[in-house]
Swiss-Prot record:
Organism: Oryza sativa subsp. indica (Rice)
A GO CC term attached to the entry: plastid
Free-text function comment from the UniProt entry: Essential for the assembly of the photosystem I (PSI) complex. May act as a chaperone-like factor to guide the assembly of the PSI subunits.
Keywords from the UniProt entry: Chloroplast, Membrane, Photosynthesis, Plastid, Repeat, Thylakoid, TPR repeat
Lineage of source species: Eukaryota, Viridiplantae, Streptophyta, Embryophyta, Tracheophyta
Keyword ATP-binding assigned: no
Family: Belongs to the Ycf3 family.
Protein name from the UniProt record: Photosystem I assembly protein Ycf3
Keyword field contains Thylakoid: yes
Compartment annotation: Plastid, Chloroplast thylakoid membrane
Signal sequence bounds: none
TPR repeats: 35-68, 72-105, 120-153
Length: 170
């Protein structure tokens, strides 16, 4: 039974109903419909913290999905799962792959910056200020890209960039 039929959460049910209606009325191929079904089921599993199941659905959606834009969101969500699992190198890889297909994903740039900032903090704890600065500089570059795409967002990142003198805002 598809995951969307066994979920008891009201929001998830609403999403599933709307998604099912869209699948019926929007002209798409059967492959596109199957890809979206796997993507939808992956999102539902991910929202419940069932990451292994979510990844299985996302990988199947990737196998079926041909549109680069749609693939970017699948890759982004795979990156989110790896971030949640503390697998930062894998997460960065998936965020990069998502951005190759869709360079207008500020949330991917932000998440990459957060990972780099975290690695900088870890380098400080290990007493390696030179490595820390390199990670912080990389975080700054990613945050600048996220902010350029959505200037009103990422206020904390903007403040950090100002405080650390890595970027001046008008």
């Amino acid at each position: 039974m598809p995951r969307s039929r066994i979920n008891g959460n009201f929001i998830d049910k609403t999403f599933s109903i709307v998604a099912n209606i869209l699948l019926r009325i929007i002209p798409t191929t059967s492959g596109e419909k199957r890809a979206f079904t796997y993507y939808r089921d992956g999102m539902l599993a991910q929202s419940e913290g069932n990451y292994a199941e979510a990844l299985q659905n996302y990988y199947e959606a990737m196998r079926l999905e041909i549109d680069p834009y749609d693939r970017s969101y699948i890759l982004y969500n795979i990156g989110l799962i790896h971030t949640s699992n503390g697998e930062h190198t894998k997460a960065l890889e998936y965020y990069f792959r998502a951005l190759e297909r869709n360079p207008f994903l500020p949330q991917a740039f932000n998440n990459m910056a957060v990972i780099c900032h975290y690695r900088g903090e870890q380098a400080i704890l290990q007493g390696d200020s030179e490595i820390a600065e390199a990670w912080f500089d990389q975080a700054a570059e990613y945050w600048k890209q996220a902010i350029a795409l959505t200037p009103g967002n990422y206020i904390e990142a903007q403040n950090w960039l100002k405080i650390t003198k890595r970027f001046e805002f008008e």
